[in-house]
Amino acid sequence: MEMRNLSRRLLDQPKRAKALLQLALVISITLVTQAEETKIPRSYERFEILAAGGEKDSRDPSWKPSEGIPMEVSGMEWIEDKLAVCIRKGEIWMLENPLSADRNKINFKLFASGLHEPLGLLKDGMDLLVAQRGEVTRLRDSNNNGEADAYLTECDGWNVSGNYHAYAYGPARDGNGNLWVSLNLGMGKLANNHIGWRGWAGTISKDGSFQPKALGMRSPSGMGANLKGDLFFSDQQGTWIPATPIYHLRPGVFYGNQESLASLKSPEAPFEMKVIPKPNQDYGEALTSSERFVPPAVWLPYNKMGRSATDVQVIDQDGKFGPFDGQLLIGEFTNSAVNRVFLEEVDGQYQGACFPFLNHFPAAVLRLQFAPDGSLFVGMSNRGWSSLGNRSYGLQRITFNQKTPFVIKEMKAQPDGFELVFTEPLHPDSLTPESLKVSSFTYQYSSRYGGDEINPARHKISGIKTSMGGRSVRFKVENLRTNYVFELTTQGLRSKLGQRLKHPQAWYTLNRIPSD
C-alpha cells in the first residue's frame, strides 16, 4: 500500500510542479498588478525653513515657545530677491537667500515692528502695504538700510474694537488696480458689529479713505485674483455660513452673513437691500429671494475638504508647479493643508470644483506665496487654535519635482452631466460603469453656527465616453439641480502607467447648468 501511494506521488510530481508554477505565476502577476495600482510617486518636495521647536501642541500645559523668531506667518511678499514675512506679533522680517537649499544660509533681518496683528502684505513700488487692525500702513525704507523708517497711514476708517475676532485683511489688488481690504466680524457679546463696516470688504480710494463695496462676510481671511484679474476671497464656516465658501469678490453684492447688515444704516452705505433673505430655508431658495444675495463660486464641504479656509493664491507658473496653471490654491487652517480649486464661467457667473492637494503640514496653513522660481512658500500659525499639525507655526517651501501626479485636473459642468479631465491618460480597463458615483446635497440658510448637508440624493450615471486619448471622461447625470453640491466618488481608476488615482473624490458647486 505504501509503495503504491509513493509511486502515485512520484508520478504526480510533474503535475504538481506545473500547478505550483502556474500558481506562483498568478501570484506574481497579481502582486505586480497590485504594486502598479498602488504606486503613487511623490510629486512635490518640502523644505522646512523654520518651525516651532516643540513637538507638542501649543495648548499643552508643558509647551514652551522655541528660541528664535516666533514665525507665526501672517503675510508674505517679494521685494526684489528678498521675501518679506509679517508675523502675528507685529513684526516684518526680510529673508535673505530664501531659495537656498541650506537653511543656514537663509538670513533674517528685522524690517518693521510695533504693528497690530498684521494679516497681509503687498508690494507697491518699493514700499510695503500691510493691513493691521486699525489701518493699512505704508512702510518705506527711505535710506535703503534695510529697515522701515516711515510708517504712513494709507487707509483707515473702519470700526476697531478690542474684540479678538475683529481682524483686517489685505490689501489685495484686482485686475483693474484697485486695492481691497476685508474686515472680520467680531464674536460674542462684545462683538461690536453694529458700526464701522464689520463684515464688509472695500477699496482704498486715492485720498486714502475706505470705500465699502460688499457685505455679508464672516471671516474673509484670504483674497487673491485669478488670471483674468477677478478677485476671490475665502470665508469660514460659522454663523450664517454652513460650510467653507470661495466667493467672487465684486461691488454691490451680499454674501449671506446678516451680522454685517447694521452698517447699511450708515449715511455712507453704498447701496440698500430691498429684501433681506429669510433664514431656515434651503440655500437656493434664499438666494432667489434677495436681489443682491449671491452664491459661492465653490463650496468646500465641511470636514471632507477642511474646516477653515485661509489664503487664496492663483497658480501662474508656466508649468513650474505642475499642470495646474490658472487654478487657485486655498490654504486650510484646521486640517493643516492646501486645497485646489478649478473655476469656470457659466452664463457670466463663476462656479467649479474643489480637490484635495497637499496635506500633513506641521501647523495651520495661513498664507501662501509663490517664488520667482515657481516654488511655493507656505506660512503657518495656529494662533492658539487647534490644527492637525503638531507644531504651532512654521515656514516651508514646496517644489515640483516634475513627476506629474495622476489626479483629476478639472471637473466641468455639461448640459446633461459632467466632464472630467485627468493629468494622465486613463487605463481603458479601469473605467467601468461602477467606477463613478455621483450624489448631491445642499445647505440650509440659517443663523446657527455651521450647517449640515441636507436634501441628499444619489444620481444615476449613463453615457460614459472618453476622449483626448483617455484624458477626458464625459458622462450624463440624471436630475441635475442648481445650487447644489455634486459629490463625485471614483473607484479603481488608474492611469495607463498603472498609477492609482491619488484623490478619488471631487466636489462641484453647480450654480447654473450650461446651455451647450
Regions picked out by a protein language model, each given a short descriptive name:
Residues 466-469:
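Blade-terminus and WD-like Trp-Asp/Gly-His loop motifs, strongest in beta-propeller folds
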Residues 421-463, 488-497, 504-508:
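Short, surface-exposed alpha-helix to beta-strand junction/turn motifs within ectodomains of secreted
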Residues 1-16:
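N-terminal secretory signal peptides that target proteins for export/translocation
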Residues 502-516:
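Short beta-strand elements
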Residues 18-30:
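Bacterial N-terminal signal peptides
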Residues 36-405, 409-417, 428:
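Beta-propeller domains with acidic blade repeats across secreted/periplasmic ectodomains
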Residues 479-483:
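Surface-exposed, short loops/turns at beta-strand junctions within beta-sandwich domains
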Residues 31-35:
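Sec/Tat signal peptide C-region and signal peptidase I cleavage site
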